[in-house]
Amino acid sequence: MEELKKIAGVRAAQYVEDGMIVGLGTGSTAYYFVEEVGRRVQEEGLQVIGVTTSSRTTAQAQALGIPLKSIDEVDSVDVTVDGADEVDPNFNGIKGGGGALLMEKIVGTLTKDYIWVVDESKMVDTLGAFRLPVEVVQYGAERLFREFEKKGYKPSFREYDGVRFVTDMKNFIIDLDLGSIPDPIAFGNMLDHQVGVVEHGLFNGMVNRVIVAGKDGVRILEANK
């Protein structure tokens, strides 16, 4: 599985060209993309500016010598490569398993060519088997948790090393164990209107293409946008 992730990540780096502003994703598959961009910067003299989606990716990019700017210093991003936890046939996806969904969505929204790299196990008919992350402000988080509980969403606060996980933006994450999300657009819209919800892991209609690595090689799926 790890080899498939590496193949997909390295393949995605082919979309990066000199002079681009590049969104650097977070997670186990995006890691290999960032490594390949770093290799090209060091060995080929590739001239790019990176915009990162988490503190982890920032540290990785700095170690590789990739020049960085903050999202506030750029008007748009030419290409962003990131992973995804699930992708459905309509190119909707769940992201945020690594806890970076807010920064990932901000960068993705400003990206001209948004690419996901996944192994074939992430391609599903219906979203929802993977728990849906919902990033919430700390104030009133318990109230939101109870509300999700009443609605039957099977919520759980994300924890790390036995303590409540805090995102780079100092928020909590409530993971919803929904099983199935038949209408991700409607569910995402509902969460968008929940006071106290900062962002959620439904990335609906955002991606331009998905690079899928499987036992039979690499497939590139183009979204009809």
From Swiss-Prot:
Q: Which SUPFAM superfamilies match?
A: D-ribose-5-phosphate isomerase (RpiA), lid domain, NagB/RpiA/CoA transferase-like
Instruction: Show the CDD domains listed in the entry.
Output: RPI_A
List the transmembrane segments: none
One Pfam match, by short name?
Answer: Rib_5-P_isom_A
According to its UniProt record, the EC number is 5.3.1.6
Q: Could you tell me the Gene Ontology terms of the biological process aspect for this record?
A: pentose-phosphate shunt, non-oxidative branch
Record's catalysed reaction(s) = aldehydo-D-ribose 5-phosphate = D-ribulose 5-phosphate
**Subunit structure, interactors included:** Homodimer.
**What's the protein name?**
Ribose-5-phosphate isomerase A
Q: What is the lineage of its organism?
A: Bacteria, Bacillati, Bacillota, Bacilli, Lactobacillales
Q: Which gene encodes it?
A: rpiA
